[in-house]
């Protein structure tokens, strides 16, 4: 039996040619490396779409294209809570909902529109009405808002923060296709929706990015000042994930967060597992070292890419950072 051909960081020569030569542009490389949108685990119904039988969960196989075809929902007044005139959230079994219908009814969902004309599914979880801070949470890969909803409720209630999140273009009920340019347009639309719809000012917004979500988070934070930034398992760039020995940013690289982090003027907390098997720990360390206003990082000994939240020091560090290191008056 012939020996397999040489591989570089898990990639064969043929895979490398497919990755970088078909064609060699950042958007195509980004799409091949990074985006794994799951089958949607939720649907959003506008008020006029809710009928007598609408209380039953919508089919899990609903697609982003179907959501995009829905008529645009009426926007409640800025800061208004869920009510008869609001959109409703319906979860499939795969969302693994862990709370009661009462908590689900309190989750606010609506659509926004990006500068690239994609329809963006947005979610506001009001966990701590009296809290000063709201997290603008950019989630990781291969999940959508339906799967993250339970986590948001648990996290927000424990760190005393409200949480605003959104699905990237091509994820969940958001229309379009996932791409690097769409990532940046998506978080811009989310930022504007949080500010205008809920009246949250930049000094009360904490940008939280996890894994691929650190890419739009760093981009936005490099352009706008906010209360703080939390980078959970960040990556330096797409090429550096595939090839750890890469020392500079090439023109065909994607997600060059390492070149943007020096422009972030807000306090930055970096969190990374020392045994991360997807984005090596060296990425978190390098991002931390480039931050002009980095605070004490959280290096979780023995943690991988998807289990940092299971370690006690995760919540402890977040509470310390938000409740004691940031202004709370």
From Swiss-Prot:
EC numbers, comma separated: 3.1.2.22
A GO term, aspect molecular function: palmitoyl-(protein) hydrolase activity
Q: How is its activity regulated?
A: Inhibited by palmostatin-B.
- Catalytic activity, as annotated: S-hexadecanoyl-L-cysteinyl-[protein] + H2O = L-cysteinyl-[protein] + hexadecanoate + H(+)
> Which portions of the sequence form the region Disordered?
53-85
Which portions of the chain have biased composition (kind: Low complexity)? 53-79
Question: What keywords are annotated for this sequence in UniProt?
Answer: Cell membrane, Cell projection, Endosome, Hydrolase, Lipoprotein, Membrane, Palmitate, Postsynaptic cell membrane, Synapse
Q: What PTMs does it carry?
A: Palmitoylated on cysteine residues located in a cysteine cluster at the N-terminus which promotes membrane localization. Palmitoylation is required for post-synaptic localization and for depalmitoylating activity towards DLG4/PSD95.
Q: How does it sit in the membrane?
A: Lipid-anchor
Q: Which GO terms describe its biological process?
A: negative regulation of protein localization to microtubule; positive regulation of protein localization to endosome; protein depalmitoylation; regulation of postsynapse organization
In the UniProt entry, which residues are flagged as the active site?
A: 211 (charge relay system), 276 (charge relay system), 305 (charge relay system)
Q: Which GO terms describe its cellular component?
A: dendritic spine; endosome membrane; glutamatergic synapse; plasma membrane; postsynaptic density membrane; recycling endosome membrane
**Annotated localization:** Recycling endosome membrane; Cell projection, Dendritic spine; Postsynaptic density membrane
Relate the protein's function as given in its record.
Answer: Hydrolyzes fatty acids from S-acylated cysteine residues in proteins. Has depalmitoylating activity towards NRAS and DLG4/PSD95.
Which family does this protein fall into? Answer: Belongs to the AB hydrolase superfamily. ABHD17 family.
Output this protein's name. Answer: Alpha/beta hydrolase domain-containing protein 17C
Source organism per entry reads Homo sapiens
């Amino acid at each position: 039996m012939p020996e397999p051909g040489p591989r570089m960081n898990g990639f064969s020569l043929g895979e490398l040619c497919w990755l970088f030569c078909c064609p060699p542009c950042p958007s195509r490389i980004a799409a091949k490396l990074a985006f794994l949108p799951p089958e949607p685990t939720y649907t959003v119904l506008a008020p006029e779409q809710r009928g007598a039988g609408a209380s039953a969960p919508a089919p899990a196989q609903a697609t982003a294209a179907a959501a995009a075809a829905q008529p645009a929902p009426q926007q409640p007044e800025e800061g208004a809570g869920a009510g008869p005139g609001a959109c409703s959230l319906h979860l499939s079994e795969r969302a693994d909902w862990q709370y009661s219908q009462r908590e689900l009814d309190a989750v606010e969902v609506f659509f926004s529109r990006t500068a690239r004309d994609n329809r963006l599914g947005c979610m506001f979880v009001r966990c701590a009405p009296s809290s000063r801070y709201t997290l603008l949470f950019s989630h990781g890969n291969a999940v959508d808002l339906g799967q993250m909803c339970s986590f948001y409720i648990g996290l927000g209630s424990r760190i005393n923060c409200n949480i605003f999140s959104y699905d990237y273009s091509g994820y969940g009920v958001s229309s379009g296709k996932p791409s690097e340019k769409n990532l940046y347009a998506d978080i811009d639309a989310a930022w504007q929706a949080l500010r205008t719809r809920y009246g949250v000012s930049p000094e009360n917004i904490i940008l939280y990015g996890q894994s691929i979500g650190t890419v739009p988070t760093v981009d936005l934070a490099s352009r706008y000042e906010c209360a703080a930034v939390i980078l959970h398992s960040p990556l330096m760039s797409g090429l550096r994930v595939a090839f750890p020995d890469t020392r500079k940013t090439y023109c065909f690289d994607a997600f060059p967060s390492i070149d943007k982090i020096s422009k972030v003027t807000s306090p930055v907390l970096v969190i990374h597992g020392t045994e991360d098997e997807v984005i090596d720990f060296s990425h978190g360390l390098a991002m931390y070292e480039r931050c002009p206003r980095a605070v004490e990082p959280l290096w979780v000994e023995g943690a991988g890419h998807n289990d940092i939240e299971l370690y006690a020091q995760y919540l402890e560090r977040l509470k310390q950072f938000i409740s004691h290191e940031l202004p709370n008056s």
